[in-house]
Amino acid sequence: YFGERPVYGSNGAETMRVGTSQQAYSSSNTVIENNLFERCSGEVEVISIKSSDNIIRNNTLLECEGVVALRHGDRNTVNDNLFIGNGRRNTGGIRVVNAGHQIYDNTLVGLAGTRFFSALGVMDAVPNSLPTRYCQVVDVKMYRNTFVDCTNIEFGTGKDMERTLAPEKVSFTDNIIINKGLDQPYIAVDDVAGIQFKDN
């Protein structure tokens, strides 16, 4: 059990971090499973993954003002987690940076966050990025996830004058999105030509 953690107001207040920016391409092989994170709201990254080949599964994040952030590193897996926001401000889901991840069978309900706090945020990248910055989202598979009454699913998150590389070779398939209050199922901040949308 992890909780409660009030808003800290700056970086360095993750509830859990695996690795550092300098270890991004080292395999940690850490498994985070069967935990309850309740109102863990220290900063935007509740669980911050900064290494490769980790698994985050079967956890519940309850009213956490932040996300599971695949911040640095490749080939991480996020599956069978439950995110419940109950409409609480800045409650989020999963933020995606880097390559080779699999994100599947997660259930996300009532998440009110936007942009970096989105229920799903797939980020734009910095061209020729150092491992410690924002590397391109490539070869990422997102499938069989269920989103219910979430404020924001966003592709191209963080696009600005520096982050200009859209995701490539990404698939978003067999997902369920239910939200009667939205006119569109997701927001595309940048070009989504590199993302395959199928059977959603």
Residue spans for each PLM region:
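Glycine- and acidic/polar-rich repeat regions and solenoidal domains
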Residues: 1-199
